[in-house]
Design a protein with these regions (language model features):
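Short glycine/threonine-rich turn/loop motifs
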Residues: 1-90, 152-213
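Small beta-barrel nucleic-acid-binding modules, principally OB-folds
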Residues: 1-5, 127-159
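Periplasmic c-type cytochrome electron-transfer domains
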Residues: 54-142, 213
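Intrinsically disordered or highly flexible coil/loop and linker segments, enriched in small
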Residues: 97, 146, 150, 177-178
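N-terminal alpha-helical segment
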Residues: 13, 102, 115, 147, ...
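Short alpha-helix boundary/capping motifs
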Residues: 45, 94, 112, 147-148
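Alpha-helical structural elements of signaling/regulatory helical domains
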Residues: 26, 111, 125-128, 146, ...
Protein backbone atom coordinates (compact mmCIF):
# COMPACT_ATOMS: atom_id res chain seq x y z
CA UNK A 1 0.00 0.00 0.00
CA UNK A 2 1.01 3.61 -0.68
CA UNK A 3 0.94 4.97 2.91
CA UNK A 4 2.99 8.11 3.67
CA UNK A 5 5.29 7.95 6.67
CA UNK A 6 3.71 11.09 8.14
CA UNK A 7 0.18 9.67 7.98
CA UNK A 8 0.13 6.14 9.39
CA UNK A 9 -3.18 4.33 9.54
CA UNK A 10 -4.99 4.62 12.88
CA UNK A 11 -8.46 3.64 14.01
CA UNK A 12 -9.06 7.19 15.25
CA UNK A 13 -7.90 8.82 12.02
CA UNK A 14 -10.00 6.57 9.81
CA UNK A 15 -13.03 7.14 12.06
CA UNK A 16 -12.63 10.90 11.72
CA UNK A 17 -12.22 10.55 7.97
CA UNK A 18 -15.43 8.55 7.71
CA UNK A 19 -17.34 11.32 9.50
CA UNK A 20 -15.85 13.94 7.18
CA UNK A 21 -16.58 11.88 4.06
CA UNK A 22 -20.30 11.75 4.82
CA UNK A 23 -20.61 15.33 6.12
CA UNK A 24 -22.42 17.80 3.86
CA UNK A 25 -20.82 20.74 5.68
CA UNK A 26 -17.74 20.27 3.51
CA UNK A 27 -19.71 21.98 0.72
CA UNK A 28 -20.48 25.67 0.34
CA UNK A 29 -24.21 25.43 0.99
CA UNK A 30 -24.04 22.42 3.34
CA UNK A 31 -25.93 20.26 0.86
CA UNK A 32 -23.36 17.87 -0.59
CA UNK A 33 -20.87 15.49 0.97
CA UNK A 34 -18.16 13.44 -0.72
CA UNK A 35 -20.59 10.54 -0.56
CA UNK A 36 -23.10 12.56 -2.57
CA UNK A 37 -21.21 11.67 -5.75
CA UNK A 38 -19.13 8.71 -4.55
CA UNK A 39 -22.12 6.49 -3.82
CA UNK A 40 -21.50 3.53 -1.54
CA UNK A 41 -24.08 1.45 -3.40
CA UNK A 42 -22.12 2.06 -6.62
CA UNK A 43 -18.77 0.98 -5.16
CA UNK A 44 -18.13 4.59 -4.15
CA UNK A 45 -18.47 5.80 -7.75
CA UNK A 46 -21.60 7.03 -9.52
CA UNK A 47 -23.82 5.58 -12.27
CA UNK A 48 -23.79 8.75 -14.36
CA UNK A 49 -21.38 10.02 -17.00
CA UNK A 50 -20.90 13.44 -15.41
CA UNK A 51 -21.03 14.79 -11.87
CA UNK A 52 -23.20 17.72 -10.81
CA UNK A 53 -22.05 20.11 -8.09
CA UNK A 54 -23.92 22.15 -5.50
CA UNK A 55 -24.70 24.98 -7.94
CA UNK A 56 -26.32 22.64 -10.45
CA UNK A 57 -23.35 22.85 -12.81
CA UNK A 58 -22.54 19.63 -14.62
CA UNK A 59 -18.85 18.87 -14.90
CA UNK A 60 -16.92 17.16 -17.67
CA UNK A 61 -16.14 13.95 -15.77
CA UNK A 62 -17.76 11.72 -13.18
CA UNK A 63 -16.75 10.64 -9.70
CA UNK A 64 -14.07 7.95 -9.79
CA UNK A 65 -14.34 4.65 -7.96
CA UNK A 66 -12.72 4.83 -4.53
CA UNK A 67 -12.00 1.20 -3.71
CA UNK A 68 -8.41 -0.04 -3.36
CA UNK A 69 -6.89 3.44 -3.46
CA UNK A 70 -4.21 2.34 -1.00
CA UNK A 71 -2.44 0.68 -3.94
CA UNK A 72 -2.89 3.52 -6.41
CA UNK A 73 -0.02 5.78 -7.45
CA UNK A 74 -1.92 8.54 -9.26
CA UNK A 75 -5.22 10.29 -8.51
CA UNK A 76 -7.87 12.13 -10.54
CA UNK A 77 -8.63 11.01 -14.07
CA UNK A 78 -5.50 12.72 -15.38
CA UNK A 79 -3.23 11.56 -12.55
CA UNK A 80 -2.30 15.07 -11.48
CA UNK A 81 -2.18 14.23 -7.76
CA UNK A 82 0.37 11.77 -6.44
CA UNK A 83 -1.00 11.31 -2.91
CA UNK A 84 -4.48 10.89 -1.48
CA UNK A 85 -3.71 13.65 1.00
CA UNK A 86 -3.28 16.02 -1.94
CA UNK A 87 -6.26 14.70 -3.88
CA UNK A 88 -8.91 15.02 -1.16
CA UNK A 89 -8.38 18.77 -0.84
CA UNK A 90 -9.42 19.72 -4.37
CA UNK A 91 -13.10 18.69 -4.62
CA UNK A 92 -13.97 20.92 -1.66
CA UNK A 93 -12.61 24.07 -3.33
CA UNK A 94 -13.59 23.19 -6.91
CA UNK A 95 -16.30 25.72 -7.96
CA UNK A 96 -18.02 23.10 -10.10
CA UNK A 97 -18.10 20.55 -7.29
CA UNK A 98 -18.43 21.43 -3.59
CA UNK A 99 -17.61 25.14 -4.04
CA UNK A 100 -16.30 25.86 -0.55
CA UNK A 101 -13.06 27.03 1.04
CA UNK A 102 -11.08 25.04 3.55
CA UNK A 103 -10.93 27.92 6.07
CA UNK A 104 -14.74 27.98 6.07
CA UNK A 105 -14.89 24.20 6.47
CA UNK A 106 -12.51 24.34 9.43
CA UNK A 107 -14.61 27.10 11.02
CA UNK A 108 -17.72 24.91 10.75
CA UNK A 109 -15.94 21.92 12.25
CA UNK A 110 -14.53 23.95 15.14
CA UNK A 111 -18.08 24.82 16.20
CA UNK A 112 -19.03 21.15 16.51
CA UNK A 113 -18.03 19.49 19.79
CA UNK A 114 -18.10 16.10 18.09
CA UNK A 115 -15.32 17.12 15.73
CA UNK A 116 -13.28 18.73 18.49
CA UNK A 117 -13.26 15.32 20.18
CA UNK A 118 -12.65 13.33 16.99
CA UNK A 119 -9.72 15.48 15.88
CA UNK A 120 -8.19 15.37 19.36
CA UNK A 121 -8.46 11.58 19.47
CA UNK A 122 -6.84 11.29 16.05
CA UNK A 123 -4.17 14.00 16.12
CA UNK A 124 -3.97 15.57 19.58
CA UNK A 125 -5.08 18.91 21.01
CA UNK A 126 -5.92 21.89 18.79
CA UNK A 127 -5.73 19.61 15.76
CA UNK A 128 -8.64 20.89 13.66
CA UNK A 129 -6.93 22.11 10.52
CA UNK A 130 -6.82 21.48 6.79
CA UNK A 131 -3.82 19.16 6.82
CA UNK A 132 -5.27 16.87 9.46
CA UNK A 133 -8.65 16.81 7.73
CA UNK A 134 -6.88 15.69 4.55
CA UNK A 135 -4.93 13.05 6.45
CA UNK A 136 -8.09 11.70 8.06
CA UNK A 137 -9.97 11.54 4.77
CA UNK A 138 -7.03 9.76 3.17
CA UNK A 139 -6.91 7.23 6.00
CA UNK A 140 -10.61 6.47 5.62
CA UNK A 141 -10.32 6.07 1.86
CA UNK A 142 -7.48 3.60 2.28
CA UNK A 143 -9.82 1.34 4.27
CA UNK A 144 -12.14 0.92 1.26
CA UNK A 145 -10.79 -2.39 0.03
CA UNK A 146 -12.40 -4.93 -2.27
CA UNK A 147 -10.61 -8.22 -2.81
CA UNK A 148 -13.15 -10.99 -3.09
CA UNK A 149 -14.65 -10.58 -6.55
CA UNK A 150 -14.97 -13.50 -8.93
CA UNK A 151 -11.83 -12.27 -10.66
CA UNK A 152 -9.91 -12.13 -7.38
CA UNK A 153 -11.03 -15.68 -6.67
CA UNK A 154 -10.01 -16.72 -10.19
CA UNK A 155 -6.50 -15.35 -9.66
CA UNK A 156 -6.29 -17.25 -6.37
CA UNK A 157 -7.37 -20.46 -8.09
CA UNK A 158 -10.59 -20.82 -6.09
CA UNK A 159 -13.03 -19.98 -8.89
CA UNK A 160 -13.46 -21.15 -12.47
CA UNK A 161 -14.87 -18.79 -15.07
CA UNK A 162 -18.12 -19.64 -16.79
CA UNK A 163 -17.87 -20.01 -20.57
CA UNK A 164 -19.17 -16.47 -21.03
CA UNK A 165 -16.76 -15.03 -18.45
CA UNK A 166 -13.84 -16.88 -20.02
CA UNK A 167 -14.79 -15.50 -23.43
CA UNK A 168 -14.83 -11.98 -22.02
CA UNK A 169 -11.47 -12.45 -20.32
CA UNK A 170 -9.94 -13.87 -23.48
CA UNK A 171 -11.31 -10.95 -25.50
CA UNK A 172 -9.89 -8.50 -22.99
CA UNK A 173 -6.46 -10.05 -23.44
CA UNK A 174 -6.38 -10.33 -27.24
CA UNK A 175 -6.31 -7.95 -30.17
CA UNK A 176 -10.05 -8.35 -30.72
CA UNK A 177 -10.96 -6.54 -27.54
CA UNK A 178 -7.68 -4.64 -27.35
CA UNK A 179 -8.27 -3.70 -23.70
CA UNK A 180 -4.93 -4.91 -22.38
CA UNK A 181 -2.82 -2.38 -24.27
CA UNK A 182 -3.92 0.42 -21.91
CA UNK A 183 -5.20 -1.44 -18.87
CA UNK A 184 -2.55 -4.13 -18.77
CA UNK A 185 -2.77 -7.76 -17.78
CA UNK A 186 -3.83 -9.20 -14.46
CA UNK A 187 -0.23 -9.09 -13.23
CA UNK A 188 0.11 -5.35 -13.87
CA UNK A 189 0.79 -3.29 -10.74
CA UNK A 190 -2.32 -1.46 -9.57
CA UNK A 191 -2.26 2.15 -10.69
CA UNK A 192 -5.76 3.05 -11.75
CA UNK A 193 -8.84 0.94 -12.38
CA UNK A 194 -9.52 -2.73 -11.71
CA UNK A 195 -6.44 -3.61 -13.75
CA UNK A 196 -3.33 -1.49 -14.02
CA UNK A 197 -3.26 1.59 -16.22
CA UNK A 198 0.04 1.44 -18.05
CA UNK A 199 -0.05 5.04 -19.24
CA UNK A 200 -2.37 8.01 -19.64
CA UNK A 201 -3.58 7.87 -23.22
CA UNK A 202 -5.87 9.96 -25.40
CA UNK A 203 -8.98 7.85 -25.91
CA UNK A 204 -10.26 9.99 -28.78
CA UNK A 205 -13.53 10.94 -27.09
CA UNK A 206 -12.72 14.65 -27.25
CA UNK A 207 -11.26 14.80 -30.75
CA UNK A 208 -11.39 18.31 -32.19
CA UNK A 209 -10.56 17.65 -35.82
CA UNK A 210 -13.24 17.96 -38.49
CA UNK A 211 -14.71 14.66 -39.64
CA UNK A 212 -13.95 15.68 -43.21
CA UNK A 213 -10.21 16.02 -42.57
Amino acid sequence: PQIPADNPMTVEGARLGRHLFFDERLSGDNSQSCSGCHLQESNFAEPTSYSTGIDGITGEINAMILSNLAWQKFFFWNGRAVTLEEQVLEPVINPIEMHETWPDVIEKLEQDAKYVKLFEEAFGENAINQDNAAKALAQFLRTLITGNSKFDQYLEGTYNFTASEQLGFDMYNNEQGDCFHCHGLAATGYQMGAFGLLQFTNNGLDSTYDVGD
